[in-house]
Amino acid sequence: MTVETFKPKQTTTLDIPVKTLEAASTNAVTTGNRIGFVSLGCPKNLVDSERILTQLRIDGYEVTNSYDNADLVIVNTCGFIDAAVEESLDAVREALEENGKVIVTGCLGAKENQIREVHPDVLEITGPHSYEAVLKHVHKYVPKPEHNPFTSLIPQTGVKLTPKHYAYLKISEGCDNRCTFCIIPSLRGDLDSRPAGSILDEAKRLVESGVQEILVVSQDTSAYGKDKGGRTDFWNGMPVKQDITSLARQLGKMGAWVRLHYIYPYPWVDDLIPLMAEGLILPYLDIPMQHASPRILKMMKRPGRVDRQLEAIQRWREICPDLVIRSTFIVGFPGETEEDFQILLDFLKEARLDRVGCFKYSEVDGAVANTIAELISEDVKEDRYHRFMEVQAEISAERLARFVGRTLDILIDDVDEEGAIGRSFADAPEIDGMVFINGETELEPGMLVRARITHSDEHDLWAEVVDADTQD
């Protein structure tokens, strides 16, 4: 089941935009108890939105895509960087102006005073993953329908804000690291891993519902299970170790693509690479490295042995030659010198990463990094950002060119009058590139097709469909 949420009028400034769907559920019952919903932020926040929406539907509420038709509006906010805070406050403002009855939840909700200073008329405010509190507040202002005969129509997977063929699977909350640029632990707490059996149950339901790609997310995915003290959980009567490698191995047996996001560079990440080489999980590693200067990494409270990171990348590629590595970096961190920045550029040239995102340092309210060194001017940050992206564009083009002439499985995301648009194992939805298959207008979203790569640039691939039995 998909539910239509609506998109605020302001332009999004985040990598993951305001989530909006094209088609509303056709079996939603008209109850007069209508809730509007705005979901902002990252995929982890998206999962929180899906859980709230699922419970709203179970409770008999109708989710509407119009401010005018809503009895109340929920805004699930992001509060990680200043731009996200501004966007969230703008979304709350718009909801108040257009509707008047607003409940705020999500990461920014952990800073109630900040919201109240700008928007004192908000009805209620809760922090992140406060599902029960959100529902309690909804019941207070919009009475729960006495009976809804259609709740049995809600699938076991619940409400999803993603296309039917892929879904995010959140395996834990919080983080035990204390990176100086990040305030996530203060918003979402320390690491709290879900039981392995619960995760695998959810994954099984997703696959049985037609999901072809599971995107594993959390604040610190590779730390999964560290808080469990080595305790074993059970699934289908079998013991399952609660660590990321054991979990990934079980997920890989379910017959869907499994893509891992937000991998912190712990030593045991090495154990995941053989699973990728075996084809159990996608050979794709999203591992935010943040910088390469040992001095800056120390100030960030991040792992600082860049030589070991380069050795690891080489080792991983030897084990799994198809491995695609995505990473993110920060330029303009407080105290960053030109020498530090050159070390970062040199690292890029040596590491030859496949996909890279770059962020200009933003002063996050409450982040330790704001006060540990002199702030970098906006002009310098902008200059370094463009120099960084120029270097990486050439590297990305080189890395993508290796696929030309190969035949790959392509998961179709969209089809228009020009053809189909999909992704290979090398491309995560919404953040990486795409594969364009011109002329194939008969394909449908969710199809997995074989296609030969004919062309590439620094971001995307172009391909043509071939017979299913065609090999590389």
Curated annotation (Swiss-Prot):
Residue ranges annotated for the TRAM domain, each copy included: 401-467
Gene Ontology MF annotations: 4 iron, 4 sulfur cluster binding; aspartic acid methylthiotransferase activity; metal ion binding; protein methylthiotransferase activity
Any one Gene Ontology cellular component term annotated for this protein: cytosol
InterPro entries: Elp3/MiaA/NifB-like_rSAM, Methylthiotransferase, Methylthiotransferase_CS, Methylthiotransferase_N, Methylthiotransferase_N_sf, NA-bd_OB-fold, Ribosomal_uS12_MeSTrfase_RimO, rSAM
Keyword 4Fe-4S found: yes
Residue ranges constituting the Radical SAM core domain according to the UniProt record: 161-398
SMART domains associated with the record: Elp3
Disulfide bonds: none
Cofactor(s) recorded in Swiss-Prot or TrEMBL: [4Fe-4S] cluster
Record EC number: 2.8.4.4
Keyword Disulfide bond: no
Cofactor binding, note field: Binds 2 [4Fe-4S] clusters. One cluster is coordinated with 3 cysteines and an exchangeable S-adenosyl-L-methionine.
Domain of life, per lineage: Bacteria
Main localization, broad class: cytoplasm
Family label: Belongs to the methylthiotransferase family. RimO subfamily.
Name of the protein in its database record: Ribosomal protein uS12 methylthiotransferase RimO
